[in-house]
Curated annotation (Swiss-Prot):
InterPro entries referenced in this protein's UniProt entry, alphabetically: RNase_HII, RNase_HII/HIII, RNase_HII/HIII_dom, RNaseH-like_sf, RNaseH_sf
EC identifiers of the protein: 3.1.26.4
GO molecular function: manganese ion binding; RNA binding; RNA-DNA hybrid ribonuclease activity
Catalytic activity field: Endonucleolytic cleavage to 5'-phosphomonoester
PANTHER family reported for this sequence: RIBONUCLEASE H2 SUBUNIT A (PTHR10954), RIBONUCLEASE HII (PTHR10954:SF18)
Obligatory cofactor(s): Mn(2+); Mg(2+)
PROSITE patterns recorded: RNASE_H_2 (PS51975)
Cofactor notes: Manganese or magnesium. Binds 1 divalent metal ion per monomer in the absence of substrate. May bind a second metal ion after substrate binding.
Gene source species: Parasynechococcus marenigrum (strain WH8102)
UniProt similarity note: Belongs to the RNase HII family.
GO cellular component: cytoplasm; ribonuclease H2 complex
Protein name: Ribonuclease HII
Keywords per UniProt: Cytoplasm, Endonuclease, Hydrolase, Manganese, Metal-binding, Nuclease
Pfam family of the protein (one): RNase_HII
Length: 224
């Protein structure tokens, strides 16, 4: 069975990119078709003080996306850890394809957070068995390393089921890594905040200093 034609959009290298950064209509989650040629991509951990940034990429067909929506799939930030854990195997089963990518703390400090996040997204997309015809990117900025067709969607994880699925998989995997790393780097409370800059985390940094996996480029203003 052949692929359905992708949504019409312009190449992101064109200054007059159609759809990039535009706020979607309320029912966009229903108006963007899910099929083999469309992948949703999202990142997790961009604003953390510790650890890598993760990205997920998911390709969903319409019927499978509808089943996941009935199971409560939405933006990962709106879901409890238990609910995300329940959804991950369902997403893996229903997705036409999915992939994960990450950029290390060293890459974040060397490249900067935006290029490192884009690299994680690119790696997630490269893990898909087939190159998608269209990539839906969460946010208002284009994915610069991606040379194919793409569309940036503000609050995309609330409006595209493929992006929502990507955010759930990425967050669940990153949080699981933070749980393991909390044993290697005790005292920072990583098991509680997953590396975000909470009051507990900042107090621990002042007391213990940064670990090998803290983002030095994020801590300069905080620690001096």
């Amino acid at each position: 069975m052949g692929l359905k034609p992708p949504l019409k959009t312009r190449n992101p290298r064109n200054p007059a990119v159609a759809g990039v950064g535009l706020r979607p209509q309320p029912l966009l989650i229903d108006s963007i078709p899910c099929h083999r040629g469309v992948a949703g991509v999202d990142e997790v951990g961009r604003g953390c003080l510790f650890g890598p940034v993760f990205a997920g990429a998911v390709v969903l067909e319409a019927a499978n996306a509808s089943r996941l929506q009935q199971e409560g799939l939405t933006d990962s930030k709106r879901l409890s850890a238990r609910r995300r854990g329940d959804l991950v195997p369902l997403i893996e089963h229903e997705a036409e394809a999915w992939g994960l990518g990450q950029s290390s703390t060293r890459e974040i400090d060397r490249l900067g957070i935006r290029p490192a996040t884009e690299l994680a997204m690119l790696r997630a997309l490269q893990r898909l068995p087939n190159r998608p015809e269209l990539v839906l990117v969460d946010g208002n900025l284009p994915l610069r390393p991606w040379t194919g067709e793409q569309r940036s969607i503000v609050a995309g994880d609330q409006h595209s089921l493929a992006i929502a699925a990507a955010s759930v998989i990425a967050k669940q995997c990153r949080d699981a890594l933070m749980q393991r790393l909390s044993q290697r780097f005790p005292g920072y409370g990583l098991e509680r905040h997953a590396g975000y800059g909470t009051a507990l985390h900042r107090a621990a940094l002042l007391d213990l200093g940064p670990s090998a996996l803290h983002r030095r480029s994020f801590l300069r203003r905080f620690l001096g």
